[in-house]
């Protein structure tokens, strides 16, 4: 039974008189000492994303009915987006440490040592729900948020990537969403001044009602100058930095923790609005401030805004926080405490300040045209107090709000792995026709239309641009050192077998970084799944995390940051499970960096990691999906020992200067890998068939742990000797040269034909000239 309130208007928030005592369920609720203007009903509680048992937990915790503002605070802090309550148990199983890890999960971003007193700071996170509702602003503020995560740690951003998933190309909303998201990513990143060096774009009907926008950013910092969010010291000023607070984004974190339904348009006001030029000023002001010794702790205001940043800083430091909302800079009149606490206005920071540096800090932010306001203080009582118009509108236990939020062990079903395909169940197709079809398909064609809208060269350090295996950026101040970045996942594999799919996402990211010659250092995960309250969805999440963990351990590729996005469903239809992995690698000498394009004619082509017949696994391949419309059978097995051995071997060859081109072998198998190498270089290749082996398996099988290499004929004996010593399969499979790609006995396909198909699909789709389904 809801508490009965009699509401009287006052100059501040409405005050309320209540019965001396009331009952809610079986619990006696003490009279509230905090004024309230809104009646707390079961419907209101449900609209805040809180389950009845969670609301009962709140009542038990605080011993009274929460105020409306407190209800909003609990809703924000206890939702999936902020608390990770459904995934925390399993995230704890991931490997997060290593010899180069300076800071693992739990901070704004991960930090990894790259020698010479330098470190790379990076993270990937989602902005899925906002980008579907308002694609331009949703994507733009996703980029802004991840950039703030990086420079909050004291790092200057040097690279960005984005992994985008859209619905079927023939869905009426897809073209609009692609245009808006790509424009938003480019509009923010380009204006801010960070190069976009890689990413993914894929289409599938399962994303029709719930697209994915996963944004990655990396920055450089000094290893001895990393800034954390843990508040320290009692009675110290809590300072608001950056842009003013408005009503945009109120309830955004709660919206991001719920499924979509017919009311989706009503959620448009929960999408934030970004300003990249203000963010650029905020970056410069923060980095300047950090050099003064004024910063004790700092946290960006992202999901749940002022609420989450204040609670996290206090809870991590075992301190209380007191805020006075009348000191918060606002850009709209008559904002309520609820709105100010839950606003997700962009380009804002919260800091615990060294008191003696107040005037120095203020002068820096005034110089950059940004707000600087002391809005509170740290306390020693572990309480989160919020004052507004002279009244206390919230008084809650800060640890229970923050790092002691609810944690669930949700039920999950055993994994179900599809049966293997029989040899007689492999459909035939003309090898050459299939190749032309695949390079010109929705999911395998060039993404040039997308990445040419991004500034890939700003800052002047980009060495490899989108279109290769990984983006590569030179480390400024060093003649030879560079960093490689890649983002990968194959959702159809995860759908078929979440454990193997999780392993494969890590392995392909590691492989792409290795293919440049870089040593993979560490990774960030962005786990996108449906409703975890459904055991079959929770099973996908659990098994994917198990697979990710196993791969990271074997490949020595720890997870140092990440994000979980659940409830990616519309009207009960879940997305494909999509655990995106972003990785970073170190090139000690970028002069030895490998590229995917063939370097010259009359060189030999080798396939590292080749199984018998060069390829064997056709189930869940793009050949089956895009040529024959089938998505059955198991995902390919990922032999992690082979991945490590083969990758280390390839990296060694690159470092020794024995390769002239390198490309990982993944979706589309050997055929697509060779075609992409030929298209990017304009040099053809002839690849031999394997006598007695099905050519479909040879050319389109998606066996893992493979690389296509080219080497000069004069170096072939050295490479073969090295392969034998390493115990690595590395057969010679063909030669480069000519103007065609010839696979076995199939007709030779002109590179011009492949290039036209490869480059045409995306611009034709966006111009409305083609509606090829991604099925």
From Swiss-Prot:
Residues holding ATP: 84, 123, 525, 562
Superkingdom, taxonomy of origin: Bacteria
Positions of substrate binding: 126-129, 148, 272, 344-346, 565
InterPro entries (alphabetical): PRibForGlyAmidine_synth_PurL, PurL_linker, PurM-like_C_dom, PurM-like_C_sf, PurM-like_N, PurM-like_N_sf
UniProt binding sites for Mg(2+) 1: 125, 563
Reaction equations catalysed: N(2)-formyl-N(1)-(5-phospho-beta-D-ribosyl)glycinamide + L-glutamine + ATP + H2O = 2-formamido-N(1)-(5-O-phospho-beta-D-ribosyl)acetamidine + L-glutamate + ADP + phosphate + H(+)
GO CC field: cytoplasm
Binding-site residues, Mg(2+) 2: 149, 300
Signal peptide range in chain numbering: none
EC number: 6.3.5.3
Pathway(s): Purine metabolism; IMP biosynthesis via de novo pathway; 5-amino-1-(5-phospho-D-ribosyl)imidazole from N(2)-formyl-N(1)-(5-phospho-D-ribosyl)glycinamide: step 1/2
Protein keywords: ATP-binding, Cytoplasm, Ligase, Magnesium, Metal-binding, Nucleotide-binding, Purine biosynthesis
The protein's assembly and partners: Monomer. Part of the FGAM synthase complex composed of 1 PurL, 1 PurQ and 2 PurS subunits.
Protein name (record): Phosphoribosylformylglycinamidine synthase subunit PurL
Organism: Agrobacterium fabrum (strain C58 / ATCC 33970) (Agrobacterium tumefaciens (strain C58))
Lineage: Bacteria, Pseudomonadati, Pseudomonadota, Alphaproteobacteria, Hyphomicrobiales
Underlying gene: purL
